């Protein structure tokens, strides 16, 4: 057993506390933009405090956690860190709004082998921007510098969001019925799902990521941040009786739409009602991917599907378009017979 000739520090072991403090200083103004009146105290406490909004009579908390998946691999490889924070918030807050919940607060977890303050600042500023878009407060998080756990510049992200909904207004799909209409909200791209397959397509096709598609590089199509639908849908919920909403994420149409349908109902989707964004056609062609697999892996241009009474379609579409959404009638709910699949794409 030998004793070091010079004293060891945490920094010698690979953990730079000063870098962590520099990151906190860098993000303070961005985090401040997300503040809600219910938040108590400031960033940096042992626990973050948040009151329930007083407008709720019987508030129910709704929680969700998610990550960005292997989209991070592309972001790291191409040094495009600004938008993955938006993706992180979107994946959580879009899941909450499906229940009718207003996102209240968000916490993030950023883990890396060696903290790069510039990269981490870009990521957290993106998280703050996502919180602004969702209307929730970034009230805390964890930055974990863990030498030996991650290689090189790699890092990982996870997010946790809590929202609130009036107990009597929870949307759980039980009101969905035969004859309901289905409205689609356009996605901004692949969002944050299917990236292991996307990376495989890039590998086998040997495609140039800078290849121009519809006026911008392929890599920009792929890394376009996930669309956040929260504020538009909260407006819709104020004025319309929405029966169900489905966030089209991993598992695509086949897996996500049935999650909000009663057993005796199926969704009939009219594939002629929209054109896939060019990036999905490129993936299908260059990966030789079947149409079934495309609908099972990707959103194919549809980020959210909404079920509501058929006589409310026109007013709902008008409202959503006023809120800046590209929305259209994509199909309807029909009676399901026996063991039929719960999604039928025509």
Swiss-Prot record:
HAMAP family: AIRS (MF_00741). Its main location: cytoplasm. Its EC number is 6.3.3.1. GO terms for biological process: 'de novo' IMP biosynthetic process; adenine biosynthetic process. Keywords: ATP-binding, Cytoplasm, Ligase, Nucleotide-binding, Purine biosynthesis. Coiled coil: none annotated. Signal peptide: none annotated. This is Phosphoribosylformylglycinamidine cyclo-ligase. It comes from the Bacteria. The gene is purM. The keyword Nuclease does not apply. It catalyses: 2-formamido-N(1)-(5-O-phospho-beta-D-ribosyl)acetamidine + ATP = 5-amino-1-(5-phospho-beta-D-ribosyl)imidazole + ADP + phosphate + H(+). One of its GO terms (molecular function) is phosphoribosylamine-glycine ligase activity. It holds the Pfam family AIRS. Belongs to the AIR synthase family. The keyword Nucleotide-binding applies. Pathway: Purine metabolism; IMP biosynthesis via de novo pathway; 5-amino-1-(5-phospho-D-ribosyl)imidazole from N(2)-formyl-N(1)-(5-phospho-D-ribosyl)glycinamide: step 2/2. GO terms for cellular component: cytosol. NCBIfam families: purM. InterPro entries: PurM-like_C_dom, PurM-like_C_sf, PurM-like_N, PurM-like_N_sf, PurM_cligase. It is found in: Cytoplasm. It is an enzyme of class 6 (ligase).
């Amino acid at each position: 057993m030998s004793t070091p000739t010079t004293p060891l520090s945490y920094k010698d072991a690979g953990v730079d506390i000063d870098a962590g403090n520099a990151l906190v200083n860098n993000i303070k103004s961005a985090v401040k933009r997300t503040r809600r009146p219910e938040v108590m105290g400031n960033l940096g406490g042992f626990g973050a405090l948040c009151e329930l909004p007083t407008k709720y009579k019987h508030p129910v908390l709704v929680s969700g956690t998610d990550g960005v998946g292997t989209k991070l691999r592309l972001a790291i490889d191409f040094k495009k860190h600004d938008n993955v924070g938006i993706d992180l918030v979107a994946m959580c807050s879009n899941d909450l709004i499906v229940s009718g919940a207003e996102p209240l607060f968000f916490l993030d977890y950023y883990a890396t082998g060696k903290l790069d303050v510039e990269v981490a600042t870009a990521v957290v500023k993106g998280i703050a921007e996502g919180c602004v878009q969702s209307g929730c407060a970034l009230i805390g998080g964890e930055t974990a510098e863990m030498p030996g756990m991650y290689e090189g510049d790699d890092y990982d992200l996870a997010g946790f969001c809590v929202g609130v909904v009036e107990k009597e207004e929870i949307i759980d799909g039980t009101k969905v019925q035969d004859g309901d209409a289905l409205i689609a909200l356009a996605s901004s791209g692949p969002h944050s799902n299917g990236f292991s397959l996307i990376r495989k397509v890039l590998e086998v096709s040997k495609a140039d990521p800078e290849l121009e598609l519809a006026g911008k590089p392929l890599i920009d199509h792929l890394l376009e941040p996930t669309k956040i639908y929260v504020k538009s849908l909260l407006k819709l919920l104020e004025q319309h009786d929405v029966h169900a909403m489905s966030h089209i994420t991993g598992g695509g149409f086949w897996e996500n739409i049935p999650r909000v349908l009663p057993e005796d109902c199926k969704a009939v989707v009219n594939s002629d009602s929209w054109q896939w964004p060019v990036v999905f056609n490129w993936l299908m062609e260059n990966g030789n991917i079947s149409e079934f697999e495309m609908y099972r892996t990707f959103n194919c241009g549809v980020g959210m599907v909404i079920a509501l009474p058929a006589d409310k379609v026109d007013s709902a579409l008008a409202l959503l378009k006023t809120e800046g959404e590209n929305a259209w009638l994509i199909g309807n709910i029909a009676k399901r017979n026996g063991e039929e699949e719960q999604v039928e794409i025509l």
